[in-house]
Design a protein with these regions (language model features):
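Short acidic/histidine-centered micro-motifs embedded in hydrophobic/aromatic stretches
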Residues: 23, 27, 70-74, 93-96
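Amphipathic protein-protein interaction modules
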Residues: 38-88
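Long, charge-rich, low-complexity intrinsically disordered regions
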Residues: 1-7, 107-110
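Short coil/turn segments at secondary-structure boundaries
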Residues: 35-39, 107-109
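Short, surface-exposed loop/turn motifs that are enriched in glycine and acidic residues
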Residues: 6-14, 42-43
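Short, charge-rich, low-complexity alpha-helical interaction segments
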Residues: 10-32, 105
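Long, compositionally biased
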Residues: 85-111
Length: 111
C-alpha cells in the first residue's frame, strides 16, 4: 500500500525505481508536465520517471534524502560515480534540493 511504501522510505531498505513507479501508478493519475530542476529544464513528457518521482515526493512531503532513495539503483549509480554526467536530474537535485524544483502544471493527482 501507499502507506507501507512511505514507511519504508529512508529506512535501511533498498528501494527499486520500478517499485516506486508502480506505487505512483497505482495511487495517482499522471499528466505529463514540464518541470525545472536547478539549471535543467524538462519538457512535458521528457524524463517522466523523474517527473513522477519529484511530484510524488512533493505531494507526500518527502525530504531530499527520501526523494533520492525513491530513484533506487539510479541514485546508487550516481553515488558510485560522483564525477559522472548521467542521471542529470538526480545530480541536479543533489545540488539544489527542493529549492531547484519547479513544475509547470500538475503532474500527479491522487486517485
Amino acid at each position: 500500500t501507499l502507506n507501507d511504501f512511505l514507511a519504508q522510505i529512508g529506512e535501511n531498505t533498498q528501494l527499486d525505481f520500478e517499485d516506486t513507479i508502480a506505487v505512483i501508478s497505482e495511487n495517482y493519475d499522471y499528466t505529463p508536465a514540464a518541470f525545472h530542476n536547478g539549471d535543467v529544464s524538462n519538457e512535458a513528457g521528457q524524463n517522466e520517471g523523474s517527473c513522477k518521482i519529484f511530484a510524488f515526493a512533493q505531494l507526500n512531503d518527502l525530504n531530499e534524502k527520501q526523494t533520492l532513495a525513491c530513484f533506487g539503483r539510479f541514485y546508487q549509480d550516481v553515488l558510485a560515480t560522483p564525477e559522472g554526467t548521467d542521471h542529470g536530474n538526480i545530480r541536479n537535485f543533489m545540488n539544489t534540493g527542493w529549492s531547484g524544483i519547479r513544475f509547470e502544471g500538475t503532474a500527479l493527482t491522487a486517485r
